[in-house]
Amino acid sequence: MQENSCEYLKHCGSCTLDMPYSEQIDFKKNFIKEHFKDFHNGEIIFFRSPISKFRSRAEFGLYHDDNSLSYTMRRADGGYLKIDKCSIVDEKISVIMPVLLDLLKENQNLKAKLFGVEFITTRDEILIILLYHKDASTIIQELTWLQSKLKVGLIARSKGKKLVFGSSSLNEKLFINGKSYHYVFGDAAFIQPNRNINENMISWVLDHTTDCKDLLELYCGHGNFTIPLSFKFNKVLATEISKASINSALKNCELNGVDNIKFTRLSAEELMEAFLFKRDFRRLQDIDLRSYEFSHILVDPPRAGCDKSVLDFIRNYENIIYISCNPLTLKENLKLLCKTHSVDKFAIFDQFVHTNHIECAVVLKKY
């Protein structure tokens, strides 16, 4: 296996693990085994990632030097490092990075007060977001020209404004267990940044979801897990606080021929109030909570994990699927969850190769 040969490795603050990939795997496995030995002594599956060209979303700073312009990353020791390529980004990003930079250098108005660039890719598409310290509406003509040259979706953001040239949404296709799933989402959506690992995560969850009746999902986003799981359950109730994500999720149901999911824009705390019949919500007026027979609950919380009230709520369910982007908060949450449940399955997903980041998933079953 070819190791990370990036010329910026020892200086860039993004890839912090300067070691062969086999050693990175051992490091992460040992970390998890040590920290979770009180909760699980069974098998822990490790899902490897490609070690290059795996990241589908990336953001770079920009360094201005007279008439020159360079991409930057934060240095490991502070400050900024000028770069002209990045080995971990999707191939489509690698190809368009120098093209975009050359076009920006041609036009003083386009590059003035431009401080960052974000790239988002799917399997077949790419979207570019330019970040300005000025009112981008003053350079609409130049941005229109730039989009015509790039022939991809282009967004300019500045001081609360968002200008769109072409499309601001992306179409994705995932292949999981011999079946394809279609998604659409906007530029502000939370997406899994490693497509290969995302497919493995969904596949693993599907493989370890059995004896299914109805599913309750918290933090569902645009339906990344919801859509594939809907084919295993009678009915699904999924919650999310972002209106844009809910709209994308509804569209994704149409794209995949799914009609057994109800999406509702509620926070986890509001959902608990609804289930305890402490409060009525207009957003639930067409949903009969008593009609569901939930056999599983899936949570994919932010890095802070679930607070005690949410943990007390999800402990009511026979089967818990917990996706975690922070093993330390997962460990804290398991201290309470394992009073009523045991960890049945445990997996590590290497979303961010060459970093300390560890993504985990556990399946818990009630005693």
From Swiss-Prot:
- UniProt xrefs under Pfam families: tRNA_U5-meth_tr
> Which residues of the sequence carry a binding annotation for S-adenosyl-L-methionine?
Q192, Y219, N224, E240, D300
Naming one, the record's GO cellular component terms include: cytosol
Which residue positions are annotated as catalytic? C325, E359
Q: Does the keyword Transmembrane apply?
A: no
Task: Give the gene name.
Answer: trmA
What does the protein in this record do? Dual-specificity methyltransferase that catalyzes the formation of 5-methyluridine at position 54 (m5U54) in all tRNAs, and that of position 341 (m5U341) in tmRNA (transfer-mRNA).
Annotated EC: 2.1.1.-, 2.1.1.35
Q: Which GO terms describe its molecular function?
A: rRNA binding; tRNA (uracil(54)-C5)-methyltransferase activity, S-adenosyl methionine-dependent; tRNA binding
Its catalytic activity?
Answer: uridine(54) in tRNA + S-adenosyl-L-methionine = 5-methyluridine(54) in tRNA + S-adenosyl-L-homocysteine + H(+); uridine(341) in tmRNA + S-adenosyl-L-methionine = 5-methyluridine(341) in tmRNA + S-adenosyl-L-homocysteine + H(+)
**What's a single GO BP term from this record?**
methylation
Key words, A-Z: Methyltransferase, S-adenosyl-L-methionine, Transferase, tRNA processing
Q: What class of enzyme is it?
A: transferase
Q: What is this protein called?
A: tRNA/tmRNA (uracil-C(5))-methyltransferase
Family, according to the entry, reads as follows:
Belongs to the class I-like SAM-binding methyltransferase superfamily. RNA M5U methyltransferase family. TrmA subfamily.
